[in-house]
Amino acid sequence: MTKYALVGDVGGTNARLALCDIASGEISQAKTYSGLDYPSLEAVVRVYLDEHSVSVEDGCIAIACPITGDWVAMTNHTWAFSIAEMKKNLGFSHLEIINDFTAVSMAIPMLKKEHLIQFGGGEPVDGKPIAVYGAGTGLGVAHLVHVDKRWISLPGEGGHVDFAPNSEEEAMILEILRAEIGHVSAERVLSGPGLVNLYRAIVKSDNRLPENLRPKDITERALADSCIDCRRALSLFCVIMGRFGGDLALTMGTFGGVYIAGGIVPRFLEFFKASGFRGGFEDKGRFKDYIHGIPVYLIVHDNPGLLGSGAHLRQTLGHIL
């Protein structure tokens, strides 16, 4: 008889829940709920389990916020809870609450070739560190290492490191944004709001007044080639994505590959392919040759957060991935 566990991927707006076959890792019966419609994460879980008439003993839910102890307070939602109390209330034997990019990193060993698009470099080296990052509402970062037949995710808040410009144009962006907001992290330029910041800084650098555009507007105008400022912003976004990925590769020696997740890049895939992304990735001066062979992949799996939550839980329960 198939034994299932509950898996989840929770952001500021939606909570996506599914079942994971503990033996195979297969994800099924995924459903998305609006977080605004429920008073707590526990309430959403109960609704899902009732709707699917399933009894589970184990669960793993990825959440887009730092996980530093038993008490979880979401940074982009009002939900807050004790992991131990939620586990007890649901009657679970195991309940893991992990960072969303911990989940994405743990999905990588489970991905197949059809879930990936490669952007330069050679073949990944087995056993070497892996980096994963992705731009969405914010900028998520994690690393993954393989030790004693176990995958160990190294999550952090790497999206909040300093934005490090490496051209006159990027330095100008930094100067304008610093005058507006003070500390300029990588996330301030590599995210949906970050794309807006790039556009605004580009326009302001020419002593003009920027329009009140959303990330979607900037992308659409750039792809339609109807706004040179939007096109410059999107082009610069791609280059800085490359630079940041190259920084991750240098920091951990990620010869196992660098993986891009998140919802932004797939929206302008053809533009990204033709952009200066790989050039930015390899623009490391004396260490260009060091980084040249490191492959970069875009993850195109529909639910890497659910897949990785399942992988994390299965490994916790003693399965070898």
Curated annotation (Swiss-Prot):
| Residues reported in the UniProt entry to bind ATP | 8-13
What is the enzyme's main class? Answer: transferase
GO cellular component entries: cytosol
Q: Name one Pfam family in it.
A: Glucokinase
Q: Where in the cell is it found?
A: Cytoplasm
- Sequence intervals crossing the membrane: none
InterPro entries named among the record's database cross-references = ATPase_NBD, Bacterial_glucokinase, Glucokinase
Q: Write down the Gene3D superfamilies for this protein, in alphabetical order.
A: 3.30.420.40, 3.40.367.20
Keywords (A to Z) from UniProt: ATP-binding, Cytoplasm, Glycolysis, Kinase, Nucleotide-binding, Transferase
The record lists the catalysed reaction(s) as: D-glucose + ATP = D-glucose 6-phosphate + ADP + H(+)
An example GO biological process term is: glycolytic process
Q: Name one GO molecular function term.
A: glucokinase activity
Listed CDD domains: ASKHA_NBD_GLK
Q: What is its EC number?
A: 2.7.1.2
Tell me its family. Answer: Belongs to the bacterial glucokinase family.
Q: What is this protein called?
A: Glucokinase
Q: Which species does the entry assign this protein to?
A: Salmonella paratyphi B (strain ATCC BAA-1250 / SPB7)
Q: Which gene encodes it?
A: glk
